[in-house]
């Protein structure tokens, strides 16, 4: 068989196996060494094999776009790149996929062995490039006729199962060396073995022991089905839920759901009311705030953490961790009868809400009020994507629970990069669209990914809270280093706006300086298909100062 035919056959087998393991989306960056893989994917997409191609010129943004596709579809997604520096550009997204247990299939084309360690162009060690982060890696040999059938497919099956099987998942890496010629090949499909059975779903949690009311639930990172199961059990037992933004419950109005746990725990009355719980059950990990994890460590006499991940999500090592299917485990905890309300909790919540409303009414327009306004104008079904750093804290503290909108977060490693790309990918599979709320540094990090919004088929509104630098550092001890060091080394003001960036990528743009103009712009943007940009001018330091002042007021109650 000719080399080009071997390349085409090898690549075709790989794409067929991906499809057999549930991959419906393939993301492709431009490159020549990866041509056989890209062409094999295109052939299958063009002939209607239920495979969708996504292309982008920037590998870094493309990989984050794939994470958005995964978060919305909850299916594995493949990313194909050429050799050389293209592959390391995937590293930030692979790290996020690892920490968030997302089934990202990374496929890197490579030079064959004879072109390594000899000064050949665009050749670098790639086999172990993502080794600490991936669940499995497969370094294939160059295509060989004798290996095209059962050997290749069995190796692919074993590796792909780590990303696509039932139970805990995560990223995998396939390194595919290919010899020239890379173009003009004809596929000769080998006889392939049948797909192996999927891994059995994770079993339900073992009994947690007898429930000791009063109970308290904490909802961390959950998918919609898990969140619904937790809420069903809580409603049946009148059990309060401290809901993180990533829980899918934070924006839902329900008597059991307590949003803004950080504010509640800042008050003595709130801590006293919650402290009456004798058993705390946490579903999912990666909590956003600082007060809630600290309170759990100090208070919870009997604390369980139920997680679907196969790595620890309890940084303080205080909880009894149960690895189980979260939805099944939550339903298994359904109590026979509701528990009485925690004394003093309703009164504490009312005081917090009144204090928060008064603070917003009396302060200049900044990140807290902007976040509150955005949450009120979200159409039903539209997802709110809370960017990292200051925006997710503002969502946690100030968002209003209304329609129960999905809330998307990227808290695996909590980076500020790739957020626009991830939102664009999420919007592709979420017909109700998404509003992304990010800071100006996050927007500058991922400016290239605005190109992905130009091709978005569903609404994707990017709201940039522009406070001219890293506003989160106003809340951190970096401030104690003095104003000059704080400004030069941490906040790093830049003076940039985003109107010309929006114009460069042919996106509708609004600039807002108050709540009314923000609401009007957001309502209009939410009616438009495709991408748009809303820039909110926030006075530097104002939002973080308002947050700090509100905490001081609550602590004094």
UniProtKB/Swiss-Prot annotation:
Domain of life: Bacteria
Pathway linked to the protein: Quinol/quinone metabolism; 1,4-dihydroxy-2-naphthoate biosynthesis; 1,4-dihydroxy-2-naphthoate from chorismate: step 2/7; Quinol/quinone metabolism; menaquinone biosynthesis
Swiss-Prot/TrEMBL catalytic activity: isochorismate + 2-oxoglutarate + H(+) = 5-enolpyruvoyl-6-hydroxy-2-succinyl-cyclohex-3-ene-1-carboxylate + CO2
Required cofactor names: Mg(2+); Mn(2+); thiamine diphosphate
Cofactor note: Binds 1 thiamine pyrophosphate per subunit.
Spans annotated as Disordered: 183-206
InterPro entries, alphabetized: DHS-like_NAD/FAD-binding_dom, MenaQ_synth_MenD, MenD_middle, THDP-binding, Thiamin_PyroP_enz_TPP-bd_dom, TPP_enzyme_TPP-bd
GO molecular function, a single term: magnesium ion binding
SUPFAM superfamilies in alphabetical order: DHS-like NAD/FAD-binding domain (SSF52467), Thiamin diphosphate-binding fold (THDP-binding) (SSF52518)
Entry's EC annotation: 2.2.1.9
A Pfam cross-reference name: TPP_enzyme_N
Any one biological process term the GO annotation gives: menaquinone biosynthetic process
Function: Catalyzes the thiamine diphosphate-dependent decarboxylation of 2-oxoglutarate and the subsequent addition of the resulting succinic semialdehyde-thiamine pyrophosphate anion to isochorismate to yield 2-succinyl-5-enolpyruvyl-6-hydroxy-3-cyclohexene-1-carboxylate (SEPHCHC).
Subunit-level organization: Homodimer.
Family to which this protein belongs: Belongs to the TPP enzyme family. MenD subfamily.
NCBIfam families for the chain: menD
Protein name stated in the entry: 2-succinyl-5-enolpyruvyl-6-hydroxy-3-cyclohexene-1-carboxylate synthase
Organism: Halorhodospira halophila (strain DSM 244 / SL1) (Ectothiorhodospira halophila (strain DSM 244 / SL1))
């Amino acid at each position: 068989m000719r080399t080009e035919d071997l390349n085409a056959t090898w690549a075709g087998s790989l794409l067929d196996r991906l499809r057999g393991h549930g991959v419906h989306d393939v993301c492709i960056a431009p490159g020549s060494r990866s041509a056989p893989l890209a062409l094999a994917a295109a052939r299958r997409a063009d002939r209607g094999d239920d495979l969708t191609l996504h292309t982008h010129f920037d590998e870094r943004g493309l990989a984050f776009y794939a994470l958005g596709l995964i978060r919305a579809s909850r299916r594995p997604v493949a990313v194909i790149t050429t050799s050389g520096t293209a592959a390391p550009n995937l590293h930030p997204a692979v790290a996020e996929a690892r920490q968030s247990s997302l089934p990202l299939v990374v496929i890197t084309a490579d030079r064959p062995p004879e072109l390594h360690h000899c000064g050949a162009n665009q050749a670098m060690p790639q086999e172990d490039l993502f080794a600490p982060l991936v669940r499995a890696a497969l370094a294939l040999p160059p295509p060989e006729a004798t290996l095209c059938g059962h050997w290749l497919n069995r190796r692919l099956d074993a590796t792909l199962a780590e990303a696509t099987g039932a139970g805990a998942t995560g990223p995998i890496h396939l390194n595919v060396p290919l010899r020239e010629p890379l173009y003009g090949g004809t596929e000769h499909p080998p006889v392939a073995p049948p797909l192996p059975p999927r891994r059995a779903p994770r079993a339900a949690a073992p009994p947690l022991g007898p429930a000791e009311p009063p109970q308290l639930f904490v909802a961390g990172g959950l998918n919609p089905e898990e969140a619904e199961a937790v809420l069903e059990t809580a409603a049946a037992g009148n059990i309060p839920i401290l809901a993180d933004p990533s829980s899918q419950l934070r924006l839902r109005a329900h008597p059991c759901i307590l949003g803004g746990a950080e504010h509640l725990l800042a008050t003595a009355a709130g801590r006293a009311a919650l402290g009456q719980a004798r058993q705390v059950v946490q579903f999912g990990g990666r909590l956003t705030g600082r007060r809630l994890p600290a309170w759990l460590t100090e208070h919870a006499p009997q604390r369980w953490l139920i997680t679907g991940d196969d790595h620890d999500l309890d940084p303080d090592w205080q909880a009894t961790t149960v690895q189980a299917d979260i939805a099944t485990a939550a339903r298994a905890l359904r109590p026979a009868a509701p528990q009485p309300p925690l004394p003093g909790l309703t009164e504490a919540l009312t005081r917090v809400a009144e204090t928060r409303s008064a603070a917003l009414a009396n302060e200049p327009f900044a990140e807290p009020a902007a976040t509150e306004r955005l949450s009120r104008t979200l159409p039903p079904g539209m997802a709110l994507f809370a960017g990292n750093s200051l925006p997710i804290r503002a969502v946690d503290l100030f968002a209003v629970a209304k329609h129960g909108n999905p809330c998307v977060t990227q808290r695996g490693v909590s980076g500020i990069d790739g957020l626009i790309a991830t939102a664009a990918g999420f919007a592709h599979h979420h017909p109700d669209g998404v509003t992304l709320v990010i800071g100006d540094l996050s927007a500058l990090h991922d400016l290239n990914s605005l190109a992905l919004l130009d091709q978005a088929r569903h609404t994707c509104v990017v709201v940039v809270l522009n406070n001219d630098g890293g506003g989160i550092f106003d809340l951190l001890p970096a401030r104690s280093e003095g104003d000059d060091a704080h400004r030069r080394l941490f906040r790093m003001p830049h003076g940039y706006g985003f109107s010309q960036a929006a114009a460069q990528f042919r996106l509708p743009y609004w600039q807002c300086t108050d709540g009314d103009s923000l609401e009007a712009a957001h309502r209009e943007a939410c009616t438009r298909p495709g991408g748009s940009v809303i820039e909110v001018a926030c006075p530097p330091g104002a939002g973080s100062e308002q947050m700090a002042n509100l905490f001081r007021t609550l602590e004094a109650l």
